[in-house]
A protein has these predicted regions:
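Pyridoxal 5′-phosphate
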Residues: 1-254
Length: 254
C-alpha cells in the first residue's frame, strides 16, 4: 500500500498530492494513490501544475476526483488555470463564492443555484487570461503531447548523461522516468545564488533557492539548490551551454 493511503485516518477528508515534484522532477504514482484512497471513500486532489506540460494526462486512467493545472506552466498567461472535478464530487460541492451567472433564481429569502459547473462560475471571469490559455492549449495540442514527451525524454537522458560527467555536481532526484527538471548543488561552499549568477552571465537562466519547498529542502539536508528546467523548445546544444557554464562556475567558486 502506498504511503499516503497508509496515512488515512477516520478524520481524513481529502488527500492532496503533487503529480510531479517541481524540485526533483519525480513522478508520483497518483493512480495507485487514487485507487487506494477510493477503498476508504477519501477523495484525491492531484496538483498537475508541473506534470501537465510534460506528458499526456488522462484523468480517467488516474482515477482522481480533482486535477488542477496552472496556465503559466502551460505557456499561457499568469493568473490563468483550470481544474477538473469528477461529476460525483461536483454534485456534492456547494458554491464557495457568489456572483452573476451562478444563480438560477434569487429572492430576499431563498436562492436556487444553477447546475454545475455554472454554479461555481461566479462573476466576471478572467476573459483575456482564459482566451490566452486556450490559445496555448491549442498550440500544445497541435504539437501533440506524446510528441512533446518523446522530445523531452530524449533531452532529459542527454542532460542526465552530461551532468553525470561532472563529478562535482550532485543532482537531487534520480529516478529514470523523471520529468525534465534537474536540481543540483556543487561541491564545496559554492552557494546556489552564486552559481546562478555566473550561469546568468553566460546566458543560462536557472532558479536558485528553496523553490517554495522548505520542508523538502530540510529533508534533503540542503539550504538551497539550483534548478534547471527544460522545455519543448530546448535542444541538446543548449544542454551543452549549461554544462560549459557550470564548468566555468566550478573553476571560479571551487
Amino acid at each position: 500500500m502506498v504511503r499516503p493511503v497508509k496515512a488515512i485516518k477516520p478524520r481524513t477528508k481529502l488527500i492532496a498530492v503533487t503529480h510531479c515534484s517541481n524540485v526533483l522532477g519525480t513522478l508520483v504514482d497518483v493512480a495507485a494513490i487514487c485507487a487506494g484512497a477510493r477503498t476508504y471513500g477519501v477523495p484525491v486532489l492531484v496538483d498537475g501544475s508541473q506534470a501537465a506540460i510534460h506528458m499526456p494526462i488522462n484523468v480517467e486512467q488516474i482515477g482522481c476526483d480533482f486535477y488542477a493545472v496552472t496556465g503559466h506552466k502551460l505557456y499561457g498567461p499568469s493568473g490563468s488555470g483550470a481544474i477538473y472535478v469528477h461529476q460525483d464530487r461536483m454534485a456534492e460541492m456547494r458554491p464557495f463564492m457568489g456572483g452573476g451567472d451562478m444563480i438560477r433564481e434569487v429572492t430576499r429569502d431563498t436562492v436556487i443555484y444553477n447546475a454545475a459547473p455554472m454554479k461555481f462560475e461566479a462573476g466576471t471571469p478572467g476573459i483575456v487570461q482564459t482566451i490566452g490559455l486556450g490559445v496555448a492549449l491549442d498550440y500544445l495540442t497541435g504539437l501533440g503531447m506524446a510528441n512533446i514527451a518523446a522530445h523531452e525524454n530524449q533531452l532529459r537522458d542527454y542532460a542526465r548523461k552530461r551532468l553525470d560527467g561532472l563529478n562535482w555536481i550532485t543532482v537531487q532526484g534520480t529516478t529514470p522516468d523523471k520529468a525534465l527538471i534537474f536540481s543540483f548543488s556543487m561541491e564545496g561552499a559554492a552557494h546556489a545564488h552564486d552559481i546562478s549568477t555566473i550561469l546568468d552571465k553566460k546566458g543560462v537562466a536557472v532558479r536558485a533557492g528553496q523553490h517554495c519547498t522548505g520542508p523538502l529542502m530540510a529533508h534533503l539536508g540542503l539550504n538551497a539548490t539550483c534548478r534547471a528546467s527544460f522545455g519543448l523548445y530546448n535542444t541538446n546544444a543548449e544542454v551543452d551551454v549549461l554544462i560549459d557554464a557550470l564548468e566555468l562556475a566550478h573553476d571560479l567558486l571551487c
